[in-house]
Amino acid sequence: MKHNSYNTIFTFQKSFLTMKNLHEKLKKADYKKVKFKVTKTQHLLIKAAINGVKGNFILDTGASNSCVGFEGIDHFALKAENSKTKASGAGATGMFTQMASNNKLKLDKWKTSKLDLVIFDLSHVNEALSQYKVKPVHGIIGADVLLKGKGIIDYFNHCLYLK
């Protein structure tokens, strides 16, 4: 097929229509839609509830585990246990951690009751956010949740889909 502007427009319209129907296709496949916001720092902010308590989180595909700061122990009623694992990320390494197992996580209408959380000092994350006047977060929703929920991120429409 010879390439011309008509073919380019047709290809664009075809892919746009496919994206437009994405929500309907995923809904039929039992995916739940969760909206997120993009901050000035290009982080994806998402609202979640842990053990029935609401919080603000960064959605981070590069974080292997979901985590909360130490203040989250009381806030989310976590049963924290000491851990030998050291955390690293966002410019900090070798940080002391604790673990909290079998927590309930709810992201809009999607939920799980077996979420293990890493607990560590998130002050470096929130300090970086505050430099851009972005509100602090309670934690990070990581790849563990995305994998468990077979996550699909629609960056254009600011939606996460979980099954």
What positions do the PLM features span?
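Cationic, low-complexity basic patches in intrinsically disordered or flexible, solvent-exposed regions
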Residues: H3
